[in-house]
Curated annotation (Swiss-Prot):
This is Glyceraldehyde-3-phosphate dehydrogenase. NAD(+) binds at R12, I13, D38, S125, N320. It comes from Lactobacillus delbrueckii subsp. bulgaricus. The keyword Cell membrane does not apply. It catalyses: D-glyceraldehyde 3-phosphate + phosphate + NAD(+) = (2R)-3-phospho-glyceroyl phosphate + NADH + H(+). Belongs to the glyceraldehyde-3-phosphate dehydrogenase family. InterPro entries: GlycerAld/Erythrose_P_DH (IPR020831), GlycerAld_3-P_DH_cat (IPR020829), GlycerAld_3-P_DH_NAD(P)-bd (IPR020828), Glyceraldehyde-3-P_DH_1 (IPR006424), NAD(P)-bd_dom_sf (IPR036291). One of its GO terms (cellular component) is cytoplasm. The gene is gap. Pathway: Carbohydrate degradation; glycolysis; pyruvate from D-glyceraldehyde 3-phosphate: step 1/5. Keywords: Cytoplasm, Glycolysis, NAD, Nucleotide-binding, Oxidoreductase.
């Protein structure tokens, strides 16, 4: 039986999820997007789906009616309901599963509104706290069961970090580590200098003109994906003046002494559609549109030895929009059919 999907929030991730599901074709035969909820008009949603400043023009016929998005002749009903519990898509469209992409329903308690409205399952496209499973596909998707109803797909950085940390820990054991994500700016930042609602002085500065230190919970969230690493990793972000394309640098102290060659060989061992390996000397624009959650870069591996102590640095690239979306869709396909 086909699982019917409603996308709540048709912003950067919601639209890219729709694109990815369409582009996968027969691979998504077990699911069907039937409705969208977003607080703007179908005409605006159609325009933003078709034309994307980062990922290019969507290669499908896209138009809109008064109450629908139309892609390749198929209608997708559009709602503009601000309260999740009031979206009538279960009754009207048979929605079974909500892909929650608004950035607002980012907890078990908040996303419960979708279940109260009749949906059976919810996948949140953001970190969502300690009381929900956080799933990074290729690392811990096997922890999902048919009894799970609300699950988090984590963040783009967690999806970049987890495969690399998992490989290091399984092969060599991680004692402690710190992560830095060199991260593209996002829609929550300022185009020009201006007051920040949270009174964060750095967030008040122009995103495309500055390197801006920023917090991230991605490293701490690794404990939700890999419990054996809980409390062992922390980190921060540097938001940089690029619109997309990021990298994660992880510096660790390991249980075993290693060489750079041994570390790279270990990463190669864990290569998968979710965790790629590329020895070319790439830069950030080269990873735009990549479908892996991250690409390990062996050219940047460093092992620094001082006596009997070592620091090990490993690096993975990721498209902070599309890599995460592809990972989320992998989780969606797995979760929806349990």
């Amino acid at each position: 039986m086909t699982v019917k999907i409603g996308i709540n929030g048709f912003g950067r991730i919601g639209r890219l999820a729709f694109r990815r599901i369409m582009d996968l074709g027969e691979e998504t035969k077990d699911i069907e997007v039937v409705a969208i909820n977003d607080l703007t008009t179908p005409a605006m949603l159609a325009h933003l789906l078709k034309y994307d400043s980062t990922h290019g023009t969507f290669d499908h016929e896209v138009s809109a009616t008064e109450d629908s998005l139309v892609v390749d002749g198929k209608k997708y009903r559009v709602y503009a309901e601000p309260q999740a519990q009031n979206i009538p898509w279960v009754k009207n469209d048979g929605v079974d599963f909500v892909l929650e992409c608004t950035g607002f329903y980012t907890s078990k308690a908040k996303s419960q509104a979708h279940l109260d409205a009749g949906a059976k399952r919810v996948l949140i496209s953001a970190p969502a706290g300690n009381d929900l499973k956080t799933i990074v596909y290729s690392v811990n998707q096997d922890t999902l069961t048919a009894d799970d109803t609300i699950v988090s797909a984590g963040s783009c950085t967690t999806n970049s970090l987890a495969p690399m940390a998992n490989a290091l820990n399984k092969e060599f054991g991680i004692q402690v580590g710190t992560m830095t994500t060199i991260h593209a700016y996002t829609a929550t930042q300022k185009v020009l200098d201006g007051p920040d609602r949270g009174n964060n002085f750095r967030n008040a500065r122009a995103a495309a003109e500055n390197i801006i230190p920023h917090s991230t919970g991605a490293a701490k969230a690794i404990g939700l994906v890999l419990p054996e690493l809980n409390g062992k990793l922390d980190g921060h972000a540097q938001r940089v003046p690029v619109k997309d394309g990021s990298e994660t640098e992880l510096v660790t102290i390991l249980d075993k002494k290693v060489t750079a060659e041994e570390v790279n060989a270990a990463m190669k061992k864990y290569e998968s559609p979710s965790f790629a390996y590329n020895a070319d000397q790439i830069v950030s624009t080269d990873v735009l549109g990549m479908t892996a959650g991250s690409i390990f870069d062996p050219t940047q591996t460093q092992v620094i030895t001082a006596g009997d102590k070592q620091l090990v640095k490993t690096v993975a690239w990721y498209d902070n929009e599309y890599s995460f979306t592809c990972q989320m869709v992998r989780t969606l396909l797995h979760f929806a059919t349990l």
